[in-house]
Curated annotation (Swiss-Prot):
The lineage of its organism: Bacteria, Pseudomonadati, Pseudomonadota, Gammaproteobacteria, Enterobacterales. The gene is flgJ. This protein is shorter than other FlgJ proteins and lacks the muramidase domain. It may be degenerating and may no longer be functional. This is Putative flagellar protein FlgJ homolog. Belongs to the FlgJ family. Keywords: Bacterial flagellum biogenesis. The keyword Secreted does not apply. The keyword Metal-binding does not apply. GO terms for biological process: bacterial-type flagellum organization.
Length: 99
């Protein structure tokens, strides 16, 4: 499978999931507010990890499309695991949603 196609499929899945979540929030905002806040925190962590990783020097033999693909997938999984325990943003986001 082409690496770009795989990344595209992963991105499509994320977009579909976010669209489904937006739909659920419109139907019953109070029920899905916590899940939405957790998802926003997860996306923030993923962007943070990607930004930190991009600041590293990339002058090595392992810097290729395949390693970047698997690093992106790893960062996505890592961000999901970190966001399960949370870093404190969920409560702040939840307060903003409920205003």
């Amino acid at each position: 499978m082409n690496d770009n196609l795989l990344l595209s499929n992963i991105s499509d899945y994320n977009v579909q999931f976010i669209n489904e979540l937006k739909y659920q929030v419109r139907i019953n905002p109070k029920k899905h507010a916590l899940q939405t806040a957790k998802e926003v925190e997860g996306v923030f962590i993923q962007v943070l990890l990607k930004s930190m990783r991009s600041s590293l020097l990339k002058d090595n033999l392992l810097d290729n499309n395949q390693s970047r693909l698997y690093t992106d997938i790893y960062d996505q999984q890592l961000s999901q695991e970190i966001s399960k325990k949370g870093i404190g943003l969920t409560d702040i986001i939840l307060k903003q949603i409920e205003k």
